[in-house]
């Protein structure tokens, strides 16, 4: 079974293997240039590396590629404020449960 990109990236980030994660995301962007997923994940990686400007660029690209992609919108909302919560949305399941439509869409 092949590991989903989101799961692989989350695992690599948790293990602080940022260079490997960046390499995998770069490959994914080349293979799927119109996919929002690698850009959202690259935004998370950039935030973890304290590169907020690049993170926001990738979140915006992910959102531009697919405005219905909830994790990108959630991450833009979380990290576009002065004091972010520190939570990331790798997938829709990572968005708050209480009211996904209000908080994540």
Tell where the protein language model's regions lie, with residue ranges.
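Helix-start (N-cap) detector for alpha-helical repeat units in TPR-like alpha-solenoids
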Residues: 2, 36-37, 70-71
């Amino acid at each position: 079974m092949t590991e989903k990109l989101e799961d692989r990236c989350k695992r690599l980030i948790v293990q602080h293997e940022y260079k490997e994660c960046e390499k995998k995301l770069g490959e994914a962007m080349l293979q799927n240039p119109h996919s929002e997923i690698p850009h959202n994940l690259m935004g998370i990686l950039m935030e973890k590396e304290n590169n907020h400007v690049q993170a926001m660029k990738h979140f915006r690209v992910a959102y531009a590629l697919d405005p219905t992609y909830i994790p990108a919108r959630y991450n833009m909302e979380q990290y576009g404020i002065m004091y972010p919560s520190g939570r990331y949305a790798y997938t829709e399941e990572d968005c708050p449960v209480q009211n996904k439509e209000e908080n994540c869409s």
